[in-house]
Each structure stands twice: as C-alpha cells, then as structure tokens.
Amino acid sequence: MNGLILEGGARRCMFTAGVVDCFMDNFINFDYVAGVSAGAQIAVNYLSGQRGRSKSVIMPNNDNSSGFIKSKLSFDLNKMAYEYPYKQFPFDFKSFFNSNAICEIVATECNSGKAEYFRETGDEYLLLKKLCASCSLPLVYPMVKIGNGEYLDGSITDSIPFERAFSVGCDKLIVVLAKPIEESATDYSKIKFIVQKKYGTDYPILVETLINRFGSYQEQCKKLYEYEKAGKIFIIRPLRTNVKTFELSKENLENAYTAGYNVAQTDMSEIL
C-alpha cells in the first residue's frame, strides 16, 4: 500500500499545495493519505479532486490580509473550517467521501497528550470539526471538543505521521515537508511559563508534551531520514525558506506554490 504524508505549517503549506496540484495534474493516486494541521486541509482537497482549492484557501483575501494577527488567525480558522466549504470555496464532500483512499486527520488529545488519527466517511460536520481540531494551534486557538475528547493541533504529537502509515499497512511513502532541512519545529520550552500558565492546571500532560515537542520533532526527523536512506520514504521539501508561517505577501505565497509544483514535477520520475 502506498501512502502520502503531508506535514503542517500554516501558510508554509502553500509549497505543499503546489506539490499536490502537480500530483493531480499527473494523475497520481495513493491508497493512504494522512495530513496534519494545514496539511490535513490539503489532504482532503486532494482526495476530493479539487485542484487549486488549497491554494485559494491559503492565499490571504481582502478580509484577512491585514490587521492584528492573532484576531485574524482566529477569524481565519473558523472561516476556513466552517464557512469556506459551503460559501467562498465550496468543498466537494461527495467526491471526498466516495474516494477509495484511506484518509487520516491527525490531532492531539489534550488530556492524554497523545495523537489521534481521525477518519470520516460520511458526516460533513464531523469532517470539518476534525479538520478544525487538527489546525487548532496551542496558545492561539481554543480546544475543539469531539466526543469526550478535547483537541489541538496534531503537530504537537505527530508532525510527520510516517510511523502511523507503516503501522496501518503502507510499505512505501511520499512525505511532503513544509520547511527546508535547516529549519526545525517551534520550541515551546522557550515559552514554558506561558504554556504552564495557559494549560498547567487542567492539562499537565499537554504541558509536558508541548515542552518536549522540539526534541520529539528532532528525533522524528532522524527516523524519517533513516527510512529515506533505506528507500522506504521519498521526501519532497522546499530547498529554501519561501514563506513565513503566517505569511501575508501574496507574491511570496505564489512563489512558494510554484516552487512546490516545480519540485514535484522534477521528482516525477522518482514518484511514479
């Protein structure tokens, strides 16, 4: 079983949007697709067959391209999760639910501090809620309640879920990363006081997970590169920093999209 893994990274994922659109143009399909945070949004657009939708959703609009960034981030997430699929950028739920591929959306359960891998095969609202949970950045967005769980961004616990993909039966993976090799994950230990103040009373395990996240990501990348050397994983990533996490420059974002598309096209012989 072949699989596709899409790392998160907010607007850095414009690179990923270009990669995935190139896949669609070349009729490349996967048996299993897993996405984290913004990568999860791109995953469902890929499986619904909506070329260009990821780019449109990530690109700043007139109502979200300026102003106080934190309030805009909160506004953007709600619009992206619950409004865009029905209004500005209609999502093809039918095509997504009819896809033969397994799709998993990664989120972090805040009480256990563990990753959960959501699937959804028929309920539109639950699909959107799971996507929202996967994208809910700690310290910025509220937790998302699903069933008895409370969830935040999946990148806290499993930024690049290749081990999960192997555990469900994949034997060959394409992994699309949103950052160049010299860049690492957010180091929450540098803002330990803020993390503890926000979550320490009710979510002590989450606090520990956040503080350890930088080291966990580094270890995960070491394993990733071992699989790459063994020929079980093919990695696609930007060669240089194209955009910031919350980039507002449309020109920079357009360049990142083009870079992703071109890198994927160049690597096509390795991918096919």
What residues fall within each predicted segment?
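Patatin-like phospholipase
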Residues: M1-V36, V44-L272
